[in-house]
Design a protein with these regions (language model features):
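N-terminally biased helix-coil "hinge/interface" segments that flank
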Residues: 1-660
Length: 660
């Protein structure tokens, strides 16, 4: 019998399942993700399930948190953003200027008006000069034109020129969204461009391992809304896989538990992702996914992502105290397991009469990408790590190397190692398999650190480990409170969730106050998934006064979700009225003007229907069915007259994934 193969590649683990809709999970395996060569971890997971149950594979589904993690951690390849006709003030909206960071941004004349008419001629000479200037230092380009969703001509012209001059990937804003919000559209295009090399590396790794095993089945990737797209589609639009892993986890959790209404909280190595199921369906955010503080324009399952996981960096927040995340760190227990010589380095640090701030911290290469563009200080650090991990005190022989190291980390070339909640679980015997000795040494080094404002050193290593897990548990509970408040429409849910009363309600020490002991209660059960869900979520649910559900196969829920979904694509066409008696249709193919609304609507419906069906088939769907809706915006005027403002025609195409 043919089975489906589900794969989930996360920041720490790569999971694989063999799945049959009638029987459920036939075989499952979990292996470490190998960032330096993704194919190794993927191949190991695939081999493990096929050894358990050799089978013919008809379909392969892939979910991944790599894109999500890259956005949360501020990583990604350098990309050049070309803004066409944008006002200078647009850079200060939607966090666009902050998101650009050190990447080149070019503003050129051009763009359109809301009517779709040109506001200024496109300055292709300026584009040509900028592209030739910046191409050697970037891996991709992003193009965003003012009101390009009403007329994409300028974006298309720049895209074609960049392709002719460089051959490098180009992302256009109008290809990703039809929504009106120029800064957020530019932000989404930029994130997409940065993620293209990472996604290409992942898909090549999966396809290579499938080919090596003679598996010729179609490969599809989970989108952020939980639906599936063909691998070639994901290569061009990787930003749509932001929240791929979390979306797959929601689909998988629904399948595993049968729960219709619940919170779904997925704890991974890097992030905790929280979603809500209502009436058996995940809530979808039509306004766009929010990841790592950025509000994109990618339609996705309504998920709140927090930099909080088993491998989150443990640190001191000045004036506040012990903090966990948002950056991922390689657990010391894993580092010493993979590099036993690091255990000796930890012992040397512990044997010193006095500790230093860099004790228990290491750096190692993560992956080799575009290293030809490294600055001399960055190259010095990169070369120092050629033979394996090194203590930070060795790597940072000069304070002048602090910023170059941070840049290498931000680009995803280098990763730091230090104490994490996973290490704390090793110390306390809640987790095993890696080096407990390294975890104990790391905790002991932390326990002897001098006091800082907001933090008093614990009495010993075990006390420190308990404080780390308490911080993770309390922060996870507050993250769920924030998700609930956000869904209830609270204006600033992050601030409200971390007020005095919520913090005291989820605290592990009930004796914090003898006079006031507030309690909180979630209105839905809590489904906890992820490799460490059983360790944390029963206690988190208890503190939040709700039922805890940790299903069988909770550790491979994402891989299950990768093969339990379908194909879904939408196309939106807008109709405006630039003047009385004229109705303009704004479609991806261009604009057309009609003399009546019904003529315009008929054309818009045909455009939307054809576009949605084509996208669904391109995304790998079969047996595609299309539904079309139309929403008119009409304003009532004095005297009983109605004024047409605009109309939105939405076509939704749904189908089953194509089987091999």
């Amino acid at each position: 019998m043919s089975l489906s193969l589900g794969i989930d590649t996360g920041g720490t683990f790569t999971d694989a399942v063999l799945f049959d809709p009638g029987r459920g999970v036939v075989a499952a395996a979990k292996r470490l993700t190998t960032k330096h060569d993704l194919a190794l971890g993927i191949g190991a997971a695939i081999d493990a399930v096929l050894e358990q149950h050799p089978a013919e594979i008809a379909f392969v589904g892939l979910s991944t948190t790599l894109a999500t993690n890259a956005v949360v951690e501020g990583q990604g390849n350098p990309a050049c953003l070309i803004l066409i006709g944008y006002p200078e003030a647009a850079l200060d909206r939607a966090g666009l200027r902050e998101a650009i960071g050190g990447d080149p941004v070019v503003a050129v004349a051009g763009g359109h008006r809301p009517s779709g008419e040109e506001q200024a001629p496109l300055d292709l000479d300026a584009v040509r000069a900028a592209v030739l200037r910046h191409a050697p230092a970037v891996t991709a380009f992003a193009v965003a034109g003012y009101f390009a969703v009403r007329n994409p001509a300028h974006e298309q012209a720049v895209r074609d020129l960049v392709d002719d001059l460089t051959g490098k990937p180009v992302t256009c804003g109008h290809e990703l969204t039809s929504g009106l919000d120029a800064p957020r559209r530019a932000l989404t295009a930029l994130l997409n461009a940065r993620l293209i090399p990472l996604t290409a590396s992942l898909i090549r790794a999966v396809r290579g391992r499938l080919d090596a095993r003679g598996i010729k089945a179609p490969l599809m990737v989970v989108k952020g809304d939980g639906s599936l797209i063909a691998d070639r589609f994901a290569l061009a639009r990787p930003v749509e896989t932001v929240l791929s892993g979390p979306a797959a986890s929601v689909v998988g959790a629904r399948w595993l538990t049968g729960r219709e209404d619940c919170f779904v909280s997925d704890i991974g190595g890097t992030t905790t992702d929280i979603a809500i199921l209502k009436d058996g369906r995940p809530l979808v955010n039509r306004e766009g996914a929010q990841v790592g503080g950025w509000r994109t324009m990618v339609e996705a399952v309504e998920i709140r992502t927090f930099g909080l996981g088993g491998d989150s960096e443990v640190r001191i927040e000045p004036g506040i105290g012990l903090a966990v995340g948002p950056r991922r760190s390689v657990p010391l227990s894993l580092l010493a397991h993979q590099h036993p010589e690091m255990l000796a380095a930890l012992r040397r640090q512990a044997d010193r009469a006095e500790g230093i701030s860099l004790d228990g911290r290491f750096a190692l290469r993560l992956r080799a990408l575009d290293t030809d563009t490294l600055s001399p200080p960055e190259r010095r650090i990169w070369d120092a790590l050629a033979d394996g991990p090194q203590p930070l005190e060795t790597v940072l022989s000069s304070h002048l190397l602090d910023r170059p190291l941070e840049r290498l980390v931000a680009r995803g070339l280098v990763i730091l190692s230090g104490f994490t909640p996973t290490d704390a679980a090793h110390v306390l015997g809640l987790h095993g398999g890696w080096s407990r000795d390294a975890a104990l040494l790391g905790a002991a080094l932390w326990a002897r650190r001098p006091a800082e404002p907001g933090w008093t050193p614990p009495v010993d290593a075990e006390a420190f480990a308990r404080s780390v897990l308490e911080r993770l548990t309390a922060d996870s509970a507050l993250a769920l409170v924030e998700a609930a408040l956000a869904r209830d429409g609270v204006a600033d849910p992050a601030r409200e969730a971390r007020g005095l009363l919520p913090r005291r309600a989820v605290a592990g020490d009930p004796a914090a106050s003898d006079l006031l002991r507030p309690t909180l209660a979630l209105g839905l059960p809590l489904v906890g998934i992820g490799a460490s869900a059983a360790t944390y979520y029963p206690e988190i649910a208890r503190r939040l006064g709700t039922e805890s559900v940790v299903p069988e196969h909770a550790g491979v829920t994402n891989a299950i979700g990768a093969v339990a979904s379908g194909v879904l694509q939408r196309a939106i066409v807008t109709i405006t009225a630039p003047e009385e008696g004229r109705f303009r249709v704004h479609a991806p193919a261009g604009i057309r003007t009609f003399g009546s609304l019904e003529e315009a609507a008929a054309h818009a419906e045909a455009e939307a229907r054809g576009r949605a069906e084509a996208l669904a088939r391109e995304a790998g769907g079969q047996e595609v069915a299309v539904t079309v809706t139309r929403a008119d915006r009409v304003v009532s005027m004095a005297g009983g007259l109605d004024l047409f403002v605009e109309s939105t025609v939405t076509a939704t195409a749904a189908g089953r994934p194509r089987m091999g």
